Amino acid sequence: MSHLAELVASAKAAISQASDVAALDNVRVEYLGKKGHLTLQMTTLRELPPEERPAAGAVINEAKEQVQQALNARKAELESAALNARLAAETIDVSLLGRRIENGGLHPVTRTIDRIESFFGELGFTVATGPEIEDDYHNFDALNIPGHHPARADHDTFWFDTTRLLRTQTSGVQIRTMKAQQPPIRIIAPGRVYRNDYDQTHTPMFHQMEGLIVDTNISFTNLKGTLHDFLRNFFEEDLQIRFRPSYFPFTEPSAEVDVMGKNGKWLEVLGCGMVHPNVLRNVGIDPEVYSGFAFGMGMERLTMLRYGVTDLRSFFENDLRFLKQFK
């Protein structure tokens, strides 16, 4: 058994000299592996008398256990040293300023659309949408604007061909909705519209929202009450509001709505009116039974008035100095 003690001492010396986990594993294989020095000692038991074998086997197992404990202890030391070295190399200077978190924000026009949708949603309106590439029937003819009508010249329309165009208004959504369902109807139709115009108060693409109610016994009084409540909610002021007679081919009577500005001048904010009987007939609704009102407003214009923006083009230039003001 003196030879066994020498093997244990040799193994412990090799273990203490192992500089990393890989070298330590080589020592383990050399002494405790399938053909390791200590493992092979078990084969010598067959040379002993049967009555001596249990005691000799226990001594060999004890030697193997000593080596295994030495391996475990050295492995823990090496892993701890490696961790400390890595932590030292990855030291964080806690005195450095942290990275600033940039929070995004909704575009001011999106804020306006969301605010208006929320208000009318509480009144039972649902949001309806339609295609931006329209045909002249839904954009003009069904809205009481036939081909010879002078109002067509006011739109500066982007035409693809003689029948297809970029919609100049979201009114086509109203037509599609009235054709698809019978009254009562209560919708708002937000979306992008297009007109060939570009200056301080106009862009070729802008956002519009129209509203429509069709039901029995709908009157101009209902229209006025709805828009009064909306404008005072939107601007969060008890505004002075006036309805000024106007003309739109698809409503009769028609009006434009103005609010009194802080400078003492009237500011136009939207157009409205009672749905023209011809429009109702065009979609298969009997104007003798049903009536309705409609209104339309530009989202950029309302946003300009709410936030005091003077140039509509600012909404489309993606200038962060401008957009960050609305976070």
UniProtKB/Swiss-Prot annotation:
Disulfide bonds: none annotated. It holds the Pfam family tRNA-synt_2d. It comes from the Bacteria. GO terms for molecular function: ATP binding; magnesium ion binding; phenylalanine-tRNA ligase activity; tRNA binding. GO terms for biological process: phenylalanyl-tRNA aminoacylation. InterPro entries: aa-tRNA-synth_II, aa-tRNA-synth_II/BPL/LPL, Phe-tRNA-synth_IIc_asu, Phe-tRNA_ligase_II_N, Phe_tRNA_ligase_alpha1_bac, Phenylalanyl-tRNA_Synthase, tRNA-bd_arm. Mg(2+) binds at E252. Its EC number is 6.1.1.20. Binds 2 magnesium ions per tetramer. Signal peptide: none annotated. Its cofactor is Mg(2+). PANTHER family: PHENYLALANINE--TRNA LIGASE, MITOCHONDRIAL (PTHR11538:SF41), PHENYLALANYL-TRNA SYNTHETASE (PTHR11538). Belongs to the class-II aminoacyl-tRNA synthetase family. Phe-tRNA synthetase alpha subunit type 1 subfamily. This is Phenylalanine--tRNA ligase alpha subunit. It comes from Shigella sonnei (strain Ss046). The lineage of its organism: Bacteria, Pseudomonadati, Pseudomonadota, Gammaproteobacteria, Enterobacterales.
